Amino acid sequence: MKVLFVAGDPKPERWTVPIKALLPEAEVHVWDANGPAVDADYAIVWQPPEQLFEREKRLKAVFNLGAGIDGLLAVPNLPPQLPIVRLEDAGMSAQMAEYVLHQLLEASRGMETYREQQRQGTWKIHRPIKRSEWPVGVMGLGHIGKRVARTLAGLDYRVNGWARSKHDLDGVSTFSGTENLTDFLQSTRVLVNTLPLTDETRDILNHKHLSQLMPNAVVINVGR
């Protein structure tokens, strides 16, 4: 079995050495733009060049180093029947949930106001926030979107979720399809986008949709 690593990492040994340790029977190669074909069975890629598919004609599957595959699908000569395997999580969902929570707290608790008061050496008490005044809407209920929604719902935030297809999540009010998008947006003050970039989602964060959010809305974009 031959494995080809094509990810543009300046230190590919960070990947190839562990792969070789886990697959001692495999030949592990690093992509060389000026080199010959290695007749790889599998390629591990991140935004691969077109030359990969011109040169490597025996590929059985491609493993994408990330959850988003839009960069891979954009390669014009990607064989249409070639199986693609993507990372569903690898710890990213927890990191994204933490990032969203951080940004939500920054906005809802007015942390920049307090930092400015700290710089000025003043102290002024502001009205405590009510979580009920900061309903969160998560666009996209894939692995990352579900993790974000569940994390915030577990902290007693009012959470809405929207996806193209129907989902059921405990503690989350879910909406599906374009026919329910307006209701979702009008019930949302903090919009969290976790959607991938596809033909269906391109430009979905537009003036028409953003203007339907609740007053003084905040957008947290962790998608494409």
Question: Can you annotate each of these PLM segments?
Answer:
Residues D41-R115:
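Phosphate/diphosphate ligand-binding glycine-rich loop within oxidoreductases
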Residues V85, Y114-R147, T174:
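Glycine-rich NAD(P)-binding loop of Rossmann-like domains
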Residues M1-D41:
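N-terminal glycine-/charge-rich "phosphate-binding" loop or analogous flexible N-terminal tail
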Residues A149, A153:
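Gly/Ala-rich phosphate-binding loop of Rossmann-like dinucleotide-binding domains
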Residues S165-R224:
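Rossmann-like adenosine-cofactor binding region
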